[in-house]
Amino acid sequence: MFKPVDFSETSPVPPDIDLAPTQSPHHVAPSQDSSYDLLSRSSDDKIDAEKGPHDELSKHLPLFQKRPLSDTPISSNWNSPGITEENTPSDSPENSATNLKSLHRLHINDETQLKNAKIPTNDTTDYMPPSDGANEVTRIDLKDIKSPTRHHKRRPTTIDVPGLTKSKTSPDGLISKEDSGSKLVIVMVGLPATGKSFITNKLSRFLNYSLYYCKVFNVGNTRRKFAKEHGLKDQDSKFFEPKNADSTRLRDKWAMDTLDELLDYLLEGSGSVGIFDATNTSRERRKNVLARIRKRSPHLKVLFLESVCSDHALVQKNIRLKLFGPDYKGKDPESSLKDFKSRLANYLKAYEPIEDDENLQYIKMIDVGKKVIAYNIQGFLASQTVYYLLNFNLADRQIWITRSGESEDNVSGRIGGNSHLTPRGLRFAKSLPKFIARQREIFYQNLMQQKKNNENTDGNIYNDFFVWTSMRARTIGTAQYFNEDDYPIKQMKMLDELSAGDYDGMTYPEIKNNFPEEFEKRQKDKLRYRYPGIGGESYMDVINRLRPVITELERIEDNVLIITHRVVARALLGYFMNLSMGIIANLDVPLHCVYCLEPKPYGITWSLWEYDEASDSFSKVPQTDLNTTRVKEVGLVYNERRYSVIPTAPPSARSSFASDFLSRKRSNPTSASSSQSELSEQPKNSVSAQTGSNNTTLIGSNFNIKNENGDSRIPLSAPLMATNTSNNILDGGGTSISIHRPRVVPNQNNVNPLLANNNKAASNVPNVKKSAATPRQIFEIDKVDEKLSMLKNKSFLLHGKDYPNNADNNDNEDIRAKTMNRSQSHV
């Protein structure tokens, strides 16, 4: 950058290229204006020697330019205008903002006007004319100033955004354990059946997706656990009578015990946000909660979130859902309904809504987002919470997610790029509008049926249908056959694929061979790894730029089709399924398949539709043919285990064979057609169908394990296995449940063993009609399946042989050659 100078010799003449455009080379004859400087140079040698080497170096540097040549050229039309609506003076040195004192003298002539003048804050607020004693030195006793190092170590810091900020205490942008001032406690307030659990689950899901680790701490769970351990009888409505001193004392104890668990999670654990889920309907309770928090930490931010529901129909719907909750599970519905209404009346006696004179930071949601009141909001996380809560709705809608049709880069195996569709991709693009139009019609018919059945459907039930694409040519080409009058199309930069930076256009083998160290870094931590070069991104970068898309999806009441790319589709599916970041990077999003998501009050239901090139149609893949894994959801109620069924790539994902489902469909078109018809016409919102399996082996994950760096917030390795033998979709949340247990297969082709379940093993199990099977028979069948799977795993580990697969051996070779592998994908 700087040239070394030998001060013992005469400085060499620098070449012309090293000089600024405004300078002249030393060997060029000086102008008349500079002759005096040359004549007096010898007389100033002594002074120059005293100035030191820095001044000597400055003689050979280009002139400093406040606006370098890399800035916008002077001739640009985008310079600041000389005259604005406020009649700003021209930008000469005399009239610029650096000479504000002269501007005041031009407009204000006498002392009276000067005293009474109102100066605009955006122009001269920071300017103060010097006083008569401006030249006097004011001495300040430094002992009276508190040094920053003397503050408490848990002082709040500025904004932390995972993946976008970096500091000494937070190298990855996550809120550090020591920075308790940036953490948030959300205290729920409201009567039962007003939507508090719905709000907390959605809010927790959004915060965890944003990598602000959040958990819900439910006082009701503490009450039930205490009653079970101490043999207390069931708490009926009389237990919640405000005048019952004994029960009130117990309920206060349970509340404080739960709050202590929350504070331990924030102050001693890795949590950033803790949600205290309780009624907290009295001023006294809220005062005690705030005092307990301040006793543990004076720096934690506290936000009270009150849910008010004035919609009688919505309250009645929530009450019916409560009958399936843990307090009334397995009891007589009629007596349970009567008891819960009596409990609600007791809570209403002591209910005191939050008021401004309590001097709390609070949000009041009325009818689950129809009206939102925010008061005294402080802190970054609190403001993000308000922003998210403004985008709630309960409308029935569908969210369709698919990748672009097959592109030229998909065929060559190159990542990134902006290639166009292949002929096969164009066929998919032409068939997609017809499929979506049919599904839109079926969805509308189901809404009409709900209205006839008086299922609290709004008057205007006809949904618009939007199509969103990225700005890459392959997604735009996939949407080109949609009629924009019926399907408004919008291109979004946020939906672009993860940028590979310098590696854009390369294949994975090329990256591995040419940059083995970078390839290994990404294999170890795909979530945090950012591709080198300008524009290179990581999964965390994609997650951050998708936040506006997430909030818009939560806000709109219409259906939408998102045509995007693999990483973006993974991130969107991970949000709606409430998955850990370590799981998102392994979701299966094959080409020419469409995911359908339907938000529900208790979670999300999803299905997968696969394009059959031979018949030029789409078919819904039965759950028995899906490669799925059950994984534990994150950020929900503390000490509760909830699971989502997620799509995962099969061991044969890298093969060139067609999917088993399409192969069987071609071999037996009659049964496949009837199956498709039944799937298309079956009613939506069928709770009985979603809760059909209560004896299912679950494959979950323990998200509290620590990685090699001792950090338990983002696991770097695959999750652990966990099992559970009971599940209720209304109680447990999550996605729709398959009535068949996923089969676990050994690690093959470098596929994560937890995320590669082979359902083909089900073909070796006798087919039992579910309608004729009793719960006991289903339980026995699951036991046999589990033992069979264990024996096959053991056989593979001992002999190193793959499972026999007759279906693949019987496939037609012509079909293999013509059919694209639906899991062919990159990035």
UniProtKB/Swiss-Prot annotation:
Catalytic residues, per the record, are 277, 309, 404 (phosphoserine intermediate), 497, 565 (proton donor)
What's its catalytic activity? beta-D-fructose 6-phosphate + ATP = beta-D-fructose 2,6-bisphosphate + ADP + H(+)
Query: List-wise, which residues carry Phosphoserine?
Result: 92, 644, 652, 659, 667
Gene Ontology CC: one annotated term = cytosol
**Record has Transferase as a keyword:** yes
Report biased composition (Basic and acidic residues) as residue ranges: 42-59
- In this chain, ATP is annotated as bound at 190-197
| Activity regulation note | Phosphorylation results in the activation of the kinase activity.
Phosphothreonine PTM positions read 157
From the UniProt entry, list the residue stretches annotated as the region Disordered: 1-97, 149-175, 649-704, 799-827
Keywords for this protein: ATP-binding, Kinase, Nucleotide-binding, Phosphoprotein, Transferase
Tell me, what is an example of a GO biological process annotation in this record?
Answer: fructose 2,6-bisphosphate metabolic process
* Pfam families referenced in this protein's UniProt entry, alphabetically: 6PF2K, His_Phos_1
Additional comment: Present with 1710 molecules/cell in log phase SD medium.
Supply the name of the protein: 6-phosphofructo-2-kinase 1
UniProt organism field: Saccharomyces cerevisiae (strain ATCC 204508 / S288c)
